Amino acid sequence: MDKKVVVDAAVVDQTKLDPVTFEVLRSIFEYASDRMSTVLQRASFSPILADMVDFSNAIYDYDCQLLSQAANCPIHLAAMKFSAEAIIRRYGLPQIYEGDVICVNDPFQGGTHINDMTFLSPIFFEGDLLGFAVSRGHWMDLGGGAAGGQAFAGTHIAGEGLRLPPVKVYERGVVRQEIVDILMNNTRRRTS
């Protein structure tokens, strides 16, 4: 996750951003994060995502440093970085490919609670990994002892529902149907 780069001073001086270029780039990243949110909200069948806006979207660089975030539910943002880092630890950067979509909801791997599902997609340009688009949203149900996974009498995390380590839902642009089936078989509301 720590990409080591050796740069001489002359190159650094040539690559300094002037304020106008910086603002243009900042605006582009902000627009991309906000657009991610708009698409997620409009495409969602879940009232928690569509109406309550219990989700967050962000763009991180190669080192998982935040570049931009959408202005919806910022409470997720601090932990989203740790989920992204857990995904990278699990697969390693060389095994994360264009077209991959990787999810995780394990509270011990950067999650907040089981119902908050994080999805990471790598961002490539001309074959080089530049960063990651990351979304975290509250799923209504992932199994467990009670609908919604919040059983008041629960004594173990297993009672909250399906706990996923980082797993590829799409690999190189191809859906892994067995993972989708696991997710769908562990919810009471298949459309949420």
Role assignments for model-derived ranges:
Residues 30, 34-45, 65, 89-92, ...:
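Generic secondary-structure signature for well-ordered alpha-helical cores
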Residues 38-39, 43, 65-67, 81-122:
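Conserved mixed alpha/beta core segments that line enzyme active sites in large multi-domain catalysts
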Residues 60-61, 120, 124, 136:
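Core beta-strand residues in small-molecule sensory/regulatory alpha/beta domains
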Residues 73, 106-110, 136-141:
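Acidic, glycine-rich active-site loops and adjacent beta-strand->loop/helix elements
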Residues 75-87, 140-149:
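A short, polar/charged loop-to-alpha-helix boundary motif
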Residues 126-192:
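Mobile "lid/hinge" segments at catalytic clefts and subdomain interfaces of large enzymes
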